[in-house]
Amino acid sequence: ESDTSFSINSLMKLGELAQDDEGDIKTLAFSQARFATATNAEGSTTNLGLGIRHRPNDVSMVGGNVFLDYRMTDYSDAHSRLGLGGEYLWKDFEFRNNWYMAITDEKAVTVKGVNYKEKVVDGWDVEIGYRLPNNPELALFVRGFNWDYKYTQDNSGLEGAVSWQATPYVGLEAWVSNEISAVSTTLNSKLPKTDETFFGLRMNLTGSPVIFGKKDYKKNMITQMTQPVKRKYDVLLERSTGTFQNRAKSDA
């Protein structure tokens, strides 16, 4: 079973706080808003964020951000989550770290006449990326993650991805991972086993061109300053009966 999600994402410049000697942006404060829904999602997700990015020189960029993630459902009150993130880019390398923390408590919900417990799953991730110097529209990413479930085993593992900026307005990313999808909410007893692997394709259409120059690090850093933050926007929810569910690989 697969989910198809749709989202609209907007980054707004709040202020160019500093420029370099050539008049190019050096420090940027920005806000970000995103709305998403999906097949089988039972609702929608809104993300609101604030961030700052700074170029200390022509070959690097450092940034920090904070997000409020709001998961609305058609069967109960909304869930909310706080996100904190940091990023560091140097030449062809990219490093990111994000933390996701529940704001709302565990709650009782009724879905199709059945009572469950439901809560936001806390988690974190770390990502390392490498952009090919002679083909900067191509990048490779490895991301480690952990999602802290309460009534079943945690979801920990890796995601590998290949990203391709096919045109200035179209970006594609193919990925493989053992990460449980947060697009829709699944009862713990119906979650994948701990040894299962998934793959997928992401497509990003942009209104403004995204252009990377060959070994032109300054230009590439300026391009990255106005790109949406890379993080998990979907709010992962745990739905359970309140008893522990073993999802370990069976010996059979």
Q: Which ranges hold each PLM region?
A:
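Residues that define the transmembrane beta-barrel architecture of outer-membrane proteins
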Residues: 2-8, 27, 41-48, 60, ...
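Residues on the lipid-exposed face of transmembrane beta-strands in outer-membrane beta-barrel proteins
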Residues: 8-12, 48-52, 84-88, 126-130, ...
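Mobile, glycine-rich extracellular loop/lid and propeptide segments
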Residues: 43-52, 56-65, 120, 124-126, ...
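Flexible, glycine-rich linker and terminal segments associated
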Residues: 103-141, 147-152, 165-173, 177-252
